[in-house]
UniProtKB/Swiss-Prot annotation:
DNA conjugation in M.smegmatis is unidirectional with distinct donor and recipient strains; mc(2)155 is a donor strain while MKD8 is a recipient strain. Mutations in a donor strain that alter DNA transfer do not always alter DNA transfer in a recipient strain. Disruption phenotype: Loss of DNA conjugation when disrupted in recipient strain, no effect when disrupted in donor strain. The recipient strain secretes reduced amounts of EsxB. Disruption of the probable saeA-saeB-saeC operon completely blocks polar localization of EccCb1. May be involved in assembly of the ESX-1 / type VII specialized secretion system (T7SS), which exports several proteins including EsxA and EsxB. Involved in DNA conjugation in recipient (MDK8) but not donor (mc(2)155) strain. Disulfide bonds: none annotated. Pfam families: GAP1-M (PF20014), GAP1-N2 (PF20013). This is Putative ESX-1 scaffolding and assembly protein SaeB.
Length: 822
């Protein structure tokens, strides 16, 4: 069987058959490699005393020499103590050797439990000095009991030494250590000697429970340059002369300088070096109870007795003291602070009937008083903890049965802590039974239900009461008039929050009354709502009504219909979203952060006007890349012609998108296509035509519209002005397309004519000299592949005529085609 303790020594020595130098000298109790590494991680091989050791110290000098005891939890379940002493010169004559003796506690949370500092100057620590003594030092079984230097008696005598005033330092140290235990900055204590450090650490440790003291990592001797704020060591003692060199991020306190005491709820303590330390009830109680040796000594025993009555794990450092103070007349001046700590930090699972349970019960009962107002005051004032939970329960128990409280407050107030997902405390379950008495009337029952639902209480009796005792009475208009908006929404939430997405338990008249409680929230508010809060419930009621009326009758609640289908996970959502064009805000609201299913956004992308919401929808479609039809349409809505050309999408994407655009336009009624989409797609078609890439044939219908064609040309003219579309090439292509005989396989006459219009506008901006004529003719010859003289003469004639008659009506294209339909 593995023993509780394991030991290891580490030093610089030279043994027969080994290489000299720093190494593990000896281990005991079957240490595993993992345990050995944990122990070695805390070993210090440098020990710089303030005063150098004599070359040949006497036994008395060795006994009085500084030593370092460090403690920490290690690994997941272990604790370790590192005892380090100067060891003189090693076997090579090198001075400055150190001897480290490490003790590993494998079960530190098992009785008997001692404060780690009680092992200070324990006789089992090996303290060899000199190479010979180091070589002979051998481990023995650790004693069952710790040392006798740091005890309850010693720390009380130390704190209340009449020759040295230490209490102010103690009070500041208590609060600084409490903060460190709670994740605050580590504390550095400047001391005259390591022995003083041990008594300070002992005093702190005995003023908290053994389990909490086991979480306080410390060292009795370090130098300032060895400190690290992030090492995990909460309390470090250094020589007084090192205090000025303590690194930033640590709270430095000197035992030799006066600490200015603060006040609980007011000014903080301040050290001589200017460090501010927030005052806590722990030090406030200590200022009352640690004044007399007799009472202080009894207090330490009481702290341990309290800790034995509960599971001593994770206790707040001040809680055992508070429990010891509560109810004792001699400590009456600390009772308020004690009650505050007990209410905030009492642990769960205290044995029923124990003295601790009776004390806690008495404190909590006093905190909530006797009335609903008293309990409400406690809810507001008590910090989060068991006391607050008790106050919350007591308040709700009283509020739901207090007609006067329910009548005077609207809405009934609630504290910051709710009961969502928690079991109903037995006292509250009993109070709910009384509060839901049908004889109280529908208005009062609705108030009670509203309060309970808002508090997060889940009790089937609430819905039963509403369905059986409230809903039948709501046909009376006078009864409805007395029901406030909050109660109406609570009723709606309870009736719907039963897996009935269609609200079958609510008739049409009641549903209209509930849905009209408030307007549909704007999308930004609904996006932040949580299920069954006020905003969410309003939308749910309107969504249920819209679903009942159908898409055609939803009216202004069409968005609520779509949102409700999505919120309830309806299988109809994708079909409904895909079948119609929606306000982009409504579609975005319905889908939230989830991916858009299938082609749900296609009709909206084609039929909606340009808007910021549509831009967000299109960007979401492109980012998710979940449906090719939707992505192709989203590209039309978000990408400008300039970007389409600059990024070469006309080369890389347009070939793939053209059949998708044609497919969409073949199933969407032309009357449903928004002009903003038509114009953008027509501009892409012209880009394809002028760059020799495919374009959607369905655009011919858009090109027949003077307005759409003109807007598409306006989108492309900046590309010509910037030189991204060469003017000579635009004119050349426009003339060639206008003069070409009709192709029965591709009757894109209107698109060709639109290209001719663009060519005419470009020509209007030309100088019209021989350079322009020659440039356009050269491009025409290159594109047609015919550079014979007759062809060149014909091209020159066409260009010259265009430049000569710029701005004439009808256009050259119309004359070449014999006219066109407007």
């Amino acid at each position: 069987m593995t023993s509780r303790f394991g030991q290891l020594t580490y030093t610089s020595f030279d043994a027969v058959g080994t290489v000299g130098g720093w190494q593990v000298k000896e281990t005991s109790d079957a240490l595993t490699p993992e345990e050995t590494q944990l122990m070695l991680a805390g070993v210090r091989t440098v020990f710089r005393t303030v005063e150098p050791m004599p070359d040949y110290p006497t036994p008395e000098q060795l006994e009085a020499a500084p030593r370092r005891l460090a403690y920490s939890r290690v690994g997941e379940t272990y604790a370790a103590l590192w005892h380090t002493v100067p060891a003189g010169a090693d076997s090579t004559g090198r001075p400055g050797n150190v001897f480290a003796h490490v003790l590993l506690d494998r079960t530190p949370d098992v009785a008997p439990r001692h404060r780690a500092i009680q092992w200070w100057r324990s006789p089992h620590w090996l303290c060899p000095y000199g190479a010979t003594a180091v070589s002979r030092a051998a481990l023995a079984e650790p004693g069952a009991e710790p040392g006798r230097v740091v005890t309850k008696d010693s720390v009380v005598a130390f704190a209340l030494d009449t020759t040295t005033w230490r209490l102010a330092t103690l009070f500041g140290l208590l609060d600084a250590v409490a903060a460190a235990l709670d994740g605050g900055p580590p504390v550095v204590l400047g001391v005259e000697s390591p022995d003083n450090a041990a008594q300070w650490i002992g005093l702190l440790s005995f003023l908290m429970s053994p389990g909490t003291a086991a979480q306080l990592s410390f060292s009795t001797f370090d130098r300032a340059d060895q400190l690290n704020p992030h090492s995990g060591q909460m309390l470090s003692a250094v020589p007084l002369e090192d205090l000025s060199a303590v690194p930033a991020g640590m709270v430095a306190i000197s035992e030799a300088e006066t600490l200015s005491l603060g006040e609980l709820g007011g000014e903080p303590h301040r050290t001589a070096g200017g460090y501010a330390i927030d005052v806590t009830p722990w030090s406030a109680m200590a200022q009352v109870v640690v004044l007399d040796p007799g009472s202080a000594r009894r207090l330490l025993d009481d702290i341990d007795a309290v800790a034995e009555q509960v599971r001593d794990s994770g206790l707040h450092p001040a809680w055992p003291m508070a429990m010891a103070v509560a109810g004792r007349a001699e400590f009456a001046d600390a009772e308020e602070e004690a009650h505050e700590v007990i209410a905030a930090h009492s642990p769960p699972g205290v044995a029923v009937g124990s003295a601790a349970a009776r004390t806690i019960s008495g404190v909590l009962s006093a905190a909530v008083g006797t009335t609903t107002a008293d309990a409400w005051r406690a809810v507001q004032e008590l910090p989060t903890g068991p006391g607050a939970v008790f106050a919350d329960t007591t308040y709700l128990c009283r509020a739901v049965t207090d007609d006067e409280w329910l009548s005077e407050n609207s809405p009934i107030p609630l504290g910051p802590r709710m009961f969502h997902g928690k079991p109903i405390p037995p006292p509250l379950r009993t109070a709910i039974g009384r509060a839901l008495d049908p004889g109280r009337g529908p208005q009062r029952l609705l108030q009670v239900a509203d309060l309970l639902v808002r508090a997060g209480v889940e009790d089937p009796r609430i819905r039963t009461t509403l369905v059986e005792d409230v809903v039948p009475r709501l046909g009376d208009a006078e009864v409805r008039e007395r029901v406030g908006a909050d109660a109406r929404l609570t009723l709606g939430a309870v009736l719907l929050n039963d897996g009935d997405a269609n609200g079958t338990a609510i008739d049409d008249g009641l549903l209209d009354w509930l849905a009209d409680t408030a307007p549909l929230p704007p999308p930004d508010e609904l996006a932040q709502a949580t299920p069954w809060d006020r905003t969410w419930t309003i939308a749910a009621l309107r969504g249920v009504r819209a679903r009942r009326r159908g898409t055609g009758g939803a009216g202004q609640d069409a968005g609520a219909l779509l949102w409700w289908l999505r919120a309830t996970g309806s299988a109809d959502f994708e079909q409904t979203a895909t079948a119609s064009a929606w306000n982009p805000e409504d579609l975005l609201l319905a889908i939230g952060a989830d991916p858009l299913p299938g082609a749900a956004a296609v009709r909206t992308l084609v039929a909606a006007a340009d808007s910021p919401a549509l831009n967000r929808l299109a960007a979401k479609v492109i980012d998710e890349n979940g449906d090719t039809l939707a992505v192709a349409c989203a590209a039309v809505r978000t990408i400008e012609p300039t970007v389409w050309l600059q990024q070469r999408y006309v080369e890389t994407h347009q070939h793939a998108y053209v059949p998708l655009w044609d497919e969409v336009l073949s199933v969407v009624d032309p009357a449903d296509v928004h002009p903003d989409f038509s114009t953008r797609l027509l501009a892409f078609a012209l880009l394809g035509l002028f760059t020799g890439h495919p374009y959607p044939r369905a655009c011919s219908g858009f090109a027949a519209s003077d307005r759409l064609g003109g807007e598409a040309i306006e989108r492309l003219m900046p590309l010509v002005g910037e030189g991204q579309l060469a003017p000579h090439a635009v004119v050349a292509i426009g003339l060639l397309r206008a003069a070409a005989p009709p192709d029965p396989a591709h009757p894109d006459v209107t698109l060709d004519e639109l290209a001719g219009h663009l060519a005419e506008q470009v020509a209007t901006g030309m100088a019209g000299d021989d350079n322009d004529v020659d440039g356009v003719v050269a491009v025409m010859a290159q594109l047609s592949g015919d550079s014979a003289e007759p062809a060149l003469r014909g091209y020159r004639k066409m260009v010259t005529k265009l430049l000569a008659r710029r701005g004439d009506s009808p256009s050259l294209t119309a004359r070449l085609r014999g006219g066109r339909q407007a």
